[in-house]
Each structure stands twice: as structure tokens, then as C-alpha cells.
Regions:
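Conserved core of the sugar-phosphate nucleotidyltransferase
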Residues: 30-97, 107
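Short aromatic/hydrophobic "clamp" motif used to bind/position activated sugar donors
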Residues: 19
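Well-ordered alpha-helical segments embedded in enzymatic catalytic cores
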Residues: 3-6, 119
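Active-site acidic Asp-centered loop
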Residues: 22-24
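Feature captures the FAD/FMN-dependent oxidoreductase FAD-binding
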Residues: 27
């Protein structure tokens, strides 16, 4: 929340009606326009993009959600000791810009600084908060293990092709850097070098 508060002047000077908030530790491909269409159709105050975590991820590392039949979030618990569901927040949210400004200002006045706990969880029974289920690959790389596992996932041709050979395309940033160097005696296995730029 503090990072958002530091950008209040930017939010206030913007004219877009909606804001997409996206965590920087997720690996995924998403068309935010589809999430926005869902958000508008539901007349939601907040939309939380969700994922169903696999066996390799512990849901208690994330915000765990319960959702009703209409997609509305009925319960939201941040990093529970025992997760009762595998539906988690991906850290991607859509909200009306003016509402976000009001909630940030109110939270800061009350010395509340956690976006999830002090806004989403606090207002879950007051605001219309909906879940938009992600139906494609998502991985959170906030730990060394998850970072490693995500890199190992990219050895899978289907995952590589999904990210680098299917629309929408992803291009790496072009930098003029020297190539990786492998010395005599190096032992490299299970490797996939990907450099796609345009």
C-alpha cells in the first residue's frame, strides 16, 4: 500500500477510469482487457485474478480465497497456516481509479499500510470483490524454490511454446551484452537458451 501511496499524484493526474495492479513476482501471460471486461460486466469494486495452485506449490504462501457460484469472493485469508482451498490470489487486481485513491488515502490516515489486509480483507463484506480465474500457466517466483521450479518448467516444450511461440508474443529486451561463457570442464545439462527479440 505504501508503494501505491507514493504514486498517488500519478493516480490523481491520470484520467483512466480503471487501474490494473500487478505484482512483479508472477510469471504468466494475460490479456488484461478480458479481466477488465469481466470486472465491468460484474459491476465489481475489485477484481482479483486467481489461480488454482498445483501440488508443487503450498497455497499457504499466498492469499487464499473462497468464491461463491457467481464468482464473488466470500472469504480471503492472507497466508493462512492451514489453507482449506487451493484458490489463491495472483497479486493482479483491477479497481476503479477514484475508489483506489479514496481507499489509499483513508488507509494512510488510519496508519494502515497493507493492501491485502487493510483494503481487500477489511472490505470483503462491504465491497463487491470478484475472482477472475486464470486458466493458463501461472507461477509465483517469490522464493528460491519457486524461482528454480519455474525455470525447470521452462524446459517443458509446451510451456516454452506457450510463452514464446503463441500469441500474444513476448519479446525479451534487446541489450548489447557479451554471451555467456562456458569454461573448459563445464558440465551443462537440461538447458534451454531463449532469446527472442524484434
Amino acid at each position: 500500500l505504501d508503494a501505491m501511496a507514493q504514486n498517488l499524484s500519478f493516480l490523481k493526474n491520470s484520467h483512466e477510469p480503471y487501474v490494473v495492479i500487478a505484482s512483479g513476482d508472477g510469471v504468466y501471460k494475460m490479456d488484461y482487457n478480458k479481466v477488465l471486461e469481466f470486472h465491468i460486466a460484474k459491476k465489481a469494486d475489485f477484481t482479483v485474478v486467481t489461480a488454482d495452485v498445483t501440488d508443487k506449490d503450498d497455497p499457504s504462501r499466498f492469499g487464499v480465497l473462497r468464491v461463491d457460484g457467481d464468482g464473488r469472493i466470500t472469504d480471503f485469508e492472507e497466508k493462512p497456516i492451514n489453507a482449506e482451498t487451493s484458490t489463491v490470489s495472483t497479486g493482479v487486481y483491477i479497481v476503479r481509479r477514484r475508489m483506489l485513491i479514496e481507499l489509499i488515502e483513508k488507509s494512510m490516515q488510519e496508519e494502515r499500510y497493507d493492501f491485502v489486509k487493510d483494503i481487500l480483507i477489511r472490505y470483503k463484506n462491504v465491497k463487491k470483490i470478484y475472482a477472475y480465474p486464470m486458466d493458463s500457466y501461472w507461477s509465483n517466483i517469490s522464493s528460491v524454490d519457486s524461482y528454480y521450479n519455474t525455470n525447470m518448467d521452462f524446459l517443458n516444450k509446451d510451456i516454452r511454446d506457450y510463452f514464446f511461440r503463441q500469441y500474444p508474443d513476448i519479446y525479451s529486451k534487446v541489450e548489447d551484452l557479451p554471451p555467456a561463457k562456458y569454461n573448459v570442464g563445464s558440465n551443462v545439462k537440461n538447458l534451454s537458451l531463449i532469446h527472442i527479440s524484434e
